[in-house]
Amino acid sequence: MRVVLIVDIVRQEEKLIAKALEENKVQYDIINVAQEPLPFNKALGRYDVAIIRPVSMYRALYSSAVLEAAGVHTINSSDVINVCGDKILTYSKLYREGIPIPDSIIALSAEAALKAYEQRGFPLIDKPPIGSWGRLVSLIRDVFEGKTIIEHRELMGNSALKAHIVQEYIQYKGRDIRCIAIGEELLGCYARNIPPNEWRANVALGGTPSNIEVDEKLKETVVKAVSIVHGEFVSIDILEHPNKGYVVNELNDVPEFKGFMVATNINVAQKLVEYIKENYSK
């Protein structure tokens, strides 16, 4: 079996994956798509599995698609990346299958966004369908703040950033929950605790990880959400609603896991390589 690790920025997670591949004596190459092209030819077909790890959604999506065209099994597939990389597409899949999500209104223009604010009521969350690390996710307390956010988003070149997901503001327990799944297995979950002077729990923004006990309802919600999007290696962000219980906030197709490892002591990279060897060895 030969594996290719696709990257654009080599973070701690990619170093851990490379180390796990070496320790498990798996042949592998690294292709940095920020520097190297991907040809549509049979050369890429020498790989059996591609681990897709670019930070950029579009680099991840397109590199996965090119490798799939060469007959390579990609983790994750371009279909999974396309759905998980766009929160509107994610919510559409989950809502159709009855998975709890935050109450959400989609607005595709500035005028529609103002109407969505009025329907939702303040405070509310407004975020675009694409993006990571809490970027451009706004807590809006009144219409004046809302108009400012809309004006700024209208100036952005990417049309997706002008789309608005208007949501209820769920502030409960001062944390959110991140879980990681590989294949059909839930590896575990941990809490991301909101830091001082912040309302978001992202580790990139200073959120601190802590271990939690996974109950059956949380496990059921996560496993079903993963199966709906056909994710093979994904993280799942969960909010705790005071009335609705666990709601799925988003799924990540190129999951970061250093905070998860600190909180749970689970070696995610090793688990990923074991999964690949068990399912795709030749």
Swiss-Prot record:
Subunit structure: Homotetramer. Interacts with LysW.
Keyword hit for ATP-binding: yes
Catalytic activity line of the entry: [amino-group carrier protein]-C-terminal-L-glutamate + L-glutamate + ATP = [amino-group carrier protein]-C-terminal-gamma-(L-glutamyl)-L-glutamate + ADP + phosphate + H(+)
Annotated ATP binding sites: 87, 127, 131-137, 167-178, 202
Positions bound to Mg(2+) 2: E250, N252
A molecular function (GO) term: coenzyme F420-2 alpha-glutamyl ligase activity
UniProt family annotation: Belongs to the RimK family. LysX subfamily.
Gene that specifies this protein: argX
Residue ranges annotated for the ATP-grasp domain, each copy included: 91-277
Residues holding Mg(2+) 1: D237, E250
Motif (GF motif that is essential for ArgX substrate specificity): 259-260
Annotated metabolic or biological route of this protein: Amino-acid biosynthesis; L-arginine biosynthesis
GO cellular component labels: cytoplasm
GO BP annotation list: L-arginine biosynthetic process; lysine biosynthetic process; protein modification process
Documented EC number(s): 6.3.2.-
Protein name from the UniProt record: Glutamate--LysW ligase ArgX
